[in-house]
């Protein structure tokens, strides 16, 4: 897929023509016209678990009793159920059951380090299901008042290479520790002793990829809203037990950690990382912001693309509405509606003559200058050399018709017009003269693990196939 992916160039009001995949942060921060979309509904949660999919619905649990869930991964509401209260849970599907780990007390607050990490099972996460029933929780890790570790902030990993189950736990007030659990029972493996793997972080999570084990930790201060300095850091190791080392060779046992994400875009305190793999090449990272300034300063669920660069996890871009060039990875040509190229007036002295007149800027071609000559009705779409002309600038806005994990469905049209990009039953794309709200005009936009983007219609006419916008040939867009 990589050869044919589509990526974007963003037209920022201040810094125009930034390529998102190489300068996304610059483009986002320089734009004052649009805000990045955030989860909608009731996404309010603190210390969220890794997102789990159960019977077509998404669930995440937080500190306190319960959590939030979503039908589509975009609109969230309360109602997820987790007994036991406690703090900072995690959830992992093993076979046809869900293992939930959580902590009771602990945290190093008030000078006490006493606490327990417990696990319990359920066949489903849907509280309305007749199969919904948690098993009795069992203690798998503990800490004492005077211990140099807190039994809190559980993180689960089922090693895909060995089938062994691991739990990390601990806080900023001591060591992060690793213990092994029995994947059949969720109990501590008999005789297993904890291993110290990090300091100066908490809310850890373990993941595996390409021969590396990664330890994601949350560094900084929590629970202070807009003043929280939480940020997510990472180290990696060839062995699950460490040592975990960052990008400059510092061990996490010595306080090292490569930054993954920090405060940004009027949101502070990212923490409690979780990884969600949708399919090969499409990954998401979930976490909370301690304070989202645009949502009353509340602690909220956040979902970002998870990218991989040089075998390091990287937080992807927060995609937001705006005007873009849609450019092919295959050749670098831009998506455009198939209209005649209108030449601009040229009043320039020959390049070999020394200028005799004051230099005068050339104004870009405007929509008003060319639109009257465009054909009415449906128009074909093609790929061509990018010339920043009106028929190559695409306005991408939320459609207000639901979403998917981490984003809303978008509508895409030529800027300043009602010519909307539409999928056809022939696996083609055209521009229709109006927005009907049909599934073929609702677009799912996701950043892939390599930093490029995938654009998919919500549904194709006459088929259930999931297809993406690609460059079939240098000049031929299509859906495949």
Predicted features and spans:
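Secreted/periplasmic carbohydrate-active enzymes, especially glycoside hydrolases
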Residues: 1-2, 35
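Bacterial N-terminal signal peptides that target proteins for export
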Residues: 3-22
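Bacterial N-terminal signal peptides
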Residues: 19-32
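Carbohydrate-active catalytic/glycan-binding domains of CAZyme proteins
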Residues: 36-349, 354-368, 376, 385-403, ...
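Extracellular/lumenal glycan-associated surfaces
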Residues: 329-342, 414-427, 457-476
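Aromatic-rich beta-strand patches that line glycan-recognition/binding surfaces
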Residues: 350-351, 379-384, 429-434
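Short polar/acidic secondary-structure junctions
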Residues: 401-402, 435, 460-461
């Amino acid at each position: 897929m990589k050869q044919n992916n589509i990526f974007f160039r963003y037209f920022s009001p201040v810094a125009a023509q930034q390529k998102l995949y190489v300068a996304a942060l610059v483009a986002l921060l320089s734009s004052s016209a649009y805000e990045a979309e955030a989860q909608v509904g009731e996404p309010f949660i603190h210390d969220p678990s890794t997102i789990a999919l159960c019977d077509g619905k998404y669930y995440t649990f937080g500190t306190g009793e319960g959590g939030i869930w979503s039908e589509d991964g975009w609109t969230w509401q309360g109602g997820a159920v987790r007994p036991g209260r406690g703090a900072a849970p995690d959830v992992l599907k093993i076979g046809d059951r869900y293992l939930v780990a959580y902590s009771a007390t602990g945290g190093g607050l008030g000078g006490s380090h006493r606490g327990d990490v417990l696990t319990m099972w359920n066949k489903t996460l849907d509280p309305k299901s007749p199969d919904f029933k948690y098993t009795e929780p069992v203690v798998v890790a503990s800490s004492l008042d005077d211990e140099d570790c807190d039994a809190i902030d559980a993180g689960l990993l089922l090693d895909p290479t060995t089938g062994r189950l691991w739990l990390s736990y601990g806080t900023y007030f001591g060591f992060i520790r690793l213990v092994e659990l029995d994947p059949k029972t969720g109990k501590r493996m008999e005789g297993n002793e904890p291993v110290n793997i990090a300091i100066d972080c908490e809310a850890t999570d373990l993941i595996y990829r390409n021969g590396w084990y990664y330890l994601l930790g949350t560094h900084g201060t929590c629970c202070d809203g807009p003043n929280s300095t939480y940020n997510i850091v990472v180290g990696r190791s060839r062995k699950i037990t460490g040592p975990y080392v960052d990008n400059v060779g510092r061990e996490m046992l010595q306080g090292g950690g490569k930054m993954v994400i920090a405060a940004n875009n009027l949101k502070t305190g990212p923490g409690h990382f979780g990884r969600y793999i949708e399919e090969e090449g499409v990954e998401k990272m979930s976490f909370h912001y301690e304070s989202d300034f645009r949502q009353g300063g509340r602690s909220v669920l956040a979902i970002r693309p998870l990218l991989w660069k040089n075998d390091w996890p990287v937080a992807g871009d927060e995609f937001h509405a705006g005007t873009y060039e849609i450019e092919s990875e295959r050749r670098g040509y831009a998506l455009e509606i198939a209209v005649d190229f209108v030449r601009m007036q040229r009043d320039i002295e020959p390049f070999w003559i020394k200028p005799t007149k004051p230099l005068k800027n050339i104004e870009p071609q405007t929509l008003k200058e060319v639109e009257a000559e465009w054909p009415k009705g449906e128009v074909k779409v093609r790929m061509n050399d990018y010339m920043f002309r009106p028929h190559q600038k695409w306005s991408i806005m939320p459609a207000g018709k639901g979403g998917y994990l981490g984003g809303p469905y978008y509508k895409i049209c030529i800027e300043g017009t009602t010519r909307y990009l539409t999928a056809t039953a022939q696996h083609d794309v055209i521009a229709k003269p109006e927005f009907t709200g049909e599934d073929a005009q609702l677009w799912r936009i996701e950043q892939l693990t390599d930093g490029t983007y995938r654009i998919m219609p919500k549904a194709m006419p006459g088929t259930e196939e999931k297809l993406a916008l690609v460059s079939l040939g240098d000049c031929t867009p299509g859906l495949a």
